[in-house]
Amino acid sequence: MKRIIIYIICLISTITVYAQSSVRGDQAPRHFVGKIYNSQYDIYIHMDLENSSIIVPQQEIFGKIPGYLGDNKDSRKWLITNATITSDGKASLSIINDYGSEDLKATLQMLNDTTYILLQESGSTIKLARNRKWLKLPQKLIFKKDTKR
């Protein structure tokens, strides 16, 4: 009888452990996590600036990084090598191309829950391959978080 009571207590305690939520109420919202898109240039940013847990597909040699800028029409990536969240809604980024030959400093600013602005501040300009030519992106790019994807 004593064993049965001990087993029941152990069973009840394990059930209550699984009932605990992994998200605490005191955690701040995670604004700089996920994918954001720019439909004009057909590019996206896959990011986790808070934990640096992104692995670039087919380029795993770089390890875990804060994120990358990808292109839906080309396999080249621009890697976010360092990210510092400076204030609520702003992050300073260090970005390099996947060859390591070009780098720049940029700021990613969150305007609202679905709109972000990437400002290229100093260094090289982000370039994409389009129609066998390099296309320089503007200094200011607007990205949207698509909740449907």
Language-model regions, residue ranges each:
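Central antiparallel beta-sheet cores of small beta-barrel/beta-sandwich binding domains
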Residues: S21-K105, T125-R149
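Bacterial Sec-dependent N-terminal signal peptides
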Residues: M1-G25
